């Protein structure tokens, strides 16, 4: 089997509500969709959702890298040879994990369809039967965040990820307000998105949060400062998660060596796709570090890819892949049974793509043959 053509679609996914985190606000989510064709008529879909605050890639640069650098090198290659595909991509250009993830996901979709198996069967088989779905609370004033959490409990949600990271005192008020409103039996995870910057600010915040039964604090400091995460972990009993600070095996080795995290957040857009995500999970398992699979607020394409990784690995104990629930329109049909997610047994990614919606949401496109 050979890759004969790769279509690229730069789309914007409309959000139900603005998505607000420590370093930005989004009214829609820009994404690059890859449609990979083969000489056997099998088509695979991939996705890259860039975040220039995390990997240094943008929507435009990801499209450009795919069009001019990666896809020309892959025409004629066998998408089943995923180790070789990644080696070729790495030898062609350093970094750009989001662009590489889009190719990787499309290859796995093709592999699954060729073998008539869901992707999770190609990377270890199904370990988990279901995962709870966590609702993500965007940054707002304390009362509004508490009110949104209360309304989501009525819809069945039992866990929340709170976005904070603007000001330590205000963030503490936000977390206290949500905990007071939802009670002690609801899970709360706090994602700072690097917003507390350093260990001093973080330790100040943590001293005020110890009594609030927080599941974990995610990436409070600047991504590259793994030393600070290790220092904070030595000073607190609150579990710490590293997100932006983990991209590749290089950072994972440092995290393990410094004992810098209780848990890590693996994202396909940060590491380069399904294949490297599995490698990270295996590294973490050897060190006894639990994993989560998260996302950059992706469509059904990349979200389903993340779920396949999560469902196949024992060491992955939580997921935050809620992008499709946040869009008014999506190009795929990934199904959620809120408050749970359960995967089907369809081959490949297990989703159908609505080509009409894909064209409707496309801002610009191209094809490489």
Curated annotation (Swiss-Prot):
Signal peptide: none annotated. It comes from Bacillus cereus (strain ATCC 14579 / DSM 31 / CCUG 7414 / JCM 2152 / NBRC 15305 / NCIMB 9373 / NCTC 2599 / NRRL B-3711). Belongs to the mandelate racemase/muconate lactonizing enzyme family. It is an enzyme of class 5 (isomerase). GO terms for molecular function: amino-acid racemase activity; magnesium ion binding; racemase and epimerase activity. Its cofactor is Mg(2+). The keyword Isomerase applies. GO terms for biological process: peptide metabolic process. Pfam families: MR_MLE_C, MR_MLE_N. Keywords: Isomerase, Magnesium, Metal-binding. The keyword Isomerase applies. Catalyzes efficient racemization of N-succinyl-L-Arg and N-succinyl-L-Lys, suggesting that these are physiological substrates of this enzyme. Has low activity with L-Asp-L-Lys, and even lower activity with L-Leu-L-Arg, L-Leu-L-Lys, N-succinyl-L-His and N-succinyl-L-Met (in vitro). SUPFAM superfamilies: Enolase C-terminal domain-like, Enolase N-terminal domain-like. Mg(2+) binds at residues 191, 218, 243. It comes from the Bacteria. Part of a large, functionally divergent protein family. Protein modeling and substrate docking was used to predict the substrate specificity, prior to biochemical analysis. Substrate binds at residues 26, 51, 161-163, 191-193, 267, 295-296, 320-322. Binds 1 Mg(2+) ion per subunit. This is N-succinyl-L-Arg/Lys racemase. Its EC number is 5.1.1.-.
């Amino acid at each position: 089997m050979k890759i004969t053509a790769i279509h690229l679609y730069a789309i914007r996914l409309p959000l139900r509500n603005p998505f607000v985190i420590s370093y930005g606000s989004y009214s829609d989510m820009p994404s690059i969709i890859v449609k990979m064709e083969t000489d056997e008529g099998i088509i695979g879909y991939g996705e890259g959702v860039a975040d220039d605050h995390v990997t240094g890639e943008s929507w435009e640069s990801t499209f450009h890298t795919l069009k001019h650098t990666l896809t020309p090198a892959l025409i004629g290659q066998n998408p089943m040879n995923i180790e070789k595909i990644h080696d070729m991509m790495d030898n062609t250009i350093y970094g750009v994990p989001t662009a590489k993830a889009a190719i990787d996901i499309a290859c796995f979709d093709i592999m699954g369809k060729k073998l008539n198996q869901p992707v999770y069967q190609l990377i270890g088989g199904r370990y988990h039967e279901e995962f709870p779905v966590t609702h993500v609370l965007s940054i707002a004033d304390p009362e509004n965040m508490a009110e949104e959490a209360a309304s989501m409990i009525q819809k069945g949600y039992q866990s929340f990820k709170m976005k904070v990271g603007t000001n330590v005192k205000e963030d503490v008020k936000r977390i206290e307000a949500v905990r007071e409103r939802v009670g002690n039996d609801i899970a709360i995870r706090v994602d700072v998105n690097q917003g507390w910057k350093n260990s001093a600010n973080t330790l100040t915040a943590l001293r005020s949060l110890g009594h609030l039964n927080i599941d974990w604090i995610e990436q409070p400091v600047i991504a590259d400062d793994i030393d600070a995460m290790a220092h904070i972990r030595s000073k607190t009993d609150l579990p710490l998660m590293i997100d932006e600070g983990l991209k590749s095996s290089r950072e994972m080795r440092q995290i393990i060596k410094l004992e810098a995290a209780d848990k890590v957040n693996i994202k396909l857009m940060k590491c380069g796709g399904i294949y490297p995500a599995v490698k990270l999970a295996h590294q973490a398992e050897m060190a006894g570090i639990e994993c989560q699979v998260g996302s950059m607020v992706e469509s059904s394409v990349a979200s389903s890819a993340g779920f396949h990784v999560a469902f196949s690995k024992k060491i992955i104990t939580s997921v935050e892949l809620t992008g499709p629930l946040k869009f008014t329109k999506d190009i795929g049909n990934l199904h959620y049974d809120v408050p749970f997610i359960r995967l089907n047994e369809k081959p490949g990614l297990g989703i159908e793509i609505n080509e009409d919606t894909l064209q409707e949401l496309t801002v610009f496109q191209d094809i490489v043959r």
